[in-house]
Amino acid sequence: MNKAKIMLKNYTHHNTESSLTKTIVFADLDDTLFRSYRKLTSDFQNNGINTDISTLPVGAYNKKNLPEKNSHLEPFRMKMVDWIVGKADLFIPTTMRTLQQFDRINFKLFNFTNLKYIITDNGKYIHIINKTTGTVGNSVTDRNTSQEDKNKYEMLSDWANMMNTGFFDNPNNPSLSDTALFIKEQSKQNKMFHNDCFTVFNTEQLINYKNDWESTLLHSFFKNIQFNPNENIVLNGYIDGKVTNNDIIPQEVHDYMFELGFYIYQSYDRIAFVPYYQRKEYAVYYLMKMLNINSYYDLVIGLGDNDIDVNFMNLCSFAMIPQNSNLLK
């Protein structure tokens, strides 16, 4: 289904009386609204910028409470955040971060009263903010997630069930059924989609493979990846690691991972192997249907910096890319 067909379909079902959807922002976070201390250091050195990074506003804290591991906002990103806070009717973070990682954002800075939904884990989960339990996010000094913190977020159960159990069809949820059709249309060439169901993929399979590669090429690539043994793969739905060199990923590796049901995401030294059905654009499409958001009548802005952001940005009225983005290199 191309974008023109999607938009035409949206026009038919749009409720012009909607008071909720006026200006909506779907935004990636890392490298879009803030950047890591390390990446800023490299950029500032390359561009002759003498700003002390530690004086810039903190966008997100790290789990080890190390200042040099925090993420910060340059002035132009801070102005974008201020605009979103002040002008958007709805701000929906669309991130590869887990919910726990999302909760390390500096919410004293990101004081979003228009934050009602969060897309995490690259589209696997959609969370609803429960405003009755207090403010979103943990404090700077105490970021341990309490039971009250956990109650701040309510998972969209229908979406989570589709991601976790693999069933496409839900006759009681027309938005979900429509999204399932959209996913199938977008994924015609993918062997994982058949008989109106997702293939239920066991991500542990990749862990078993990683020490027993079938060829020298695969072994030479994967031996340069450091996997996190403590990562909750079943929860996140994807496998995260770091590469020790900057070599281009051979096409044979992409093909091999495709056969296993994964696509490869890479940003600088970070690499992730993500199931093909776990994509930001699918979650964005579902929310747009559920909330009656229309990219023709409403102002829908998509912000992102990486290849995995492009497709959800294409569902929006405008796509915005920050400077120093991978998409501009």
Locate predicted features.
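Short loop/turn segments at strand-loop or loop-helix junctions that form parts
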Residues: 27-39, 121-123, 129-131, 230, ...
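Active-site neighborhood of HAD-like aspartate-dependent phosphohydrolases
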Residues: 6-11, 15-93
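Short glycine-/acidic-enriched loop or helix-start segments at secondary-structure transitions
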Residues: 36-37, 43, 102-105, 129-130, ...
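Asp-based, Mg2+/Mn2+-dependent phosphohydrolase catalytic module
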Residues: 294, 315, 319-329
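Active-site phosphate-binding/coordination module
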Residues: 70-218
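Short, well-ordered alpha-helix to beta-strand connector turns
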Residues: 22, 88, 115, 122, ...
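Short, well-ordered beta-strand core segments
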Residues: 91, 118, 300, 319-320
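Conserved acidic, metal-coordinating active-site core of Asp-based
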Residues: 195-301, 306-315
